């Protein structure tokens, strides 16, 4: 009779491979999302701005419990599944015909995804649960020191790379939505992540030697082209469409437009203010603005992909002139350029964790920081920009023309190396808000103007979730005191200057 009470359609256990692919999608979904309740990094970095609901464009991250949703997505949906996948695969007995290295490769790849995810948590919050995290029997985990977590992640990363062997297999094609089980690609990903971590901690005095080793060891083995990009391609049908498509197209909403900050940087121009549009008695920069005819200096070739040509702000010239909204202000959707169709309207548009362009910028940074990887800063700067332009659909000719502009050329562009690399990296990281934010914190470039009605300076971390403050109060208090206060202005340990 007991057999009659067993639901044969309810699996007793889930294969580790299924949990891994689920965790991959959850991670990429969170990093790619434009949902204002969980991911507002594009708004913080003034790549986009809001039309009507302007709280987040003015740096209010508390009202919608954004930190909680970011925290939950990474801990509950990503790390928990990765940990369970690791345990199941590790404990699965091999058949006599199976290659043990295939299993080792799977475990190492899971480790790489875990390390990436924890680095995002540390870079967002600082001290976070780590050594006691993911234990269902411990509802009050301690928060580990952020620097100590990074040191352990570095050790784990080196071990994972040592354990990968591209002469053996790993996940099947349908169990790995990023590299389809290609171990050689995962080795490049691991080294590219290692390079990123090395650059991230390069200004921390106690980690300077470690940073140099990370960079020098990884540099020969990182991404070599856009074919190596760590990207997840979505499907054309729900529920596996790109979350941007869900938020911008399926929803029918008109919540976001490009921000004037990035528009004006990619297409410099002069403005004039003709009317007192906000009726405050004066005509100034708070009013609606018009592009001075013929004042455009140059146009970044990526603009036709980043933005829609629904609005020509200067019909007097042949080239389309784009117009961005004021960060933090109310911006009427029809009056401004829109998000590009490739991004907003393609349900299968891929989302990226790390790409070749970013890696090339990191190598340029390494050289400027005095670390002797092979090449020059200018060469890697040019490679990074070219890779970005080609990725979006531009041509080599367009890239060369752009790089020869006085304002863009590495030898003639204004500012020091941080300004040159930081500004161009910010442009190349368009639509990748978190990565852009992290780079901006390290390089302090470009200089972002204050939004219309800011509640703070530009946030350099998320505050801890309110639920943590309530339910895990002692650990929360210890962490807040340790980092110097639970504020959006408290720097992460590596954010030195």
Predicted regions and their residues:
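Internal, well-ordered domain-core segments that constitute the primary functional module
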Residues: 151-153, 158-225
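Hydrophobic-face positions in mid-chain alpha helices that act as interaction patches
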Residues: 208-363, 368-369, 374-424, 428, ...
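Membrane-proximal, proline-rich intrinsically disordered regions
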Residues: 1-58, 62-65, 92-97, 446-448, ...
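Conserved, well-structured interaction surfaces
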Residues: 51-131, 135-151, 155-170, 346-349, ...
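C-terminal functional modules
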Residues: 386-497
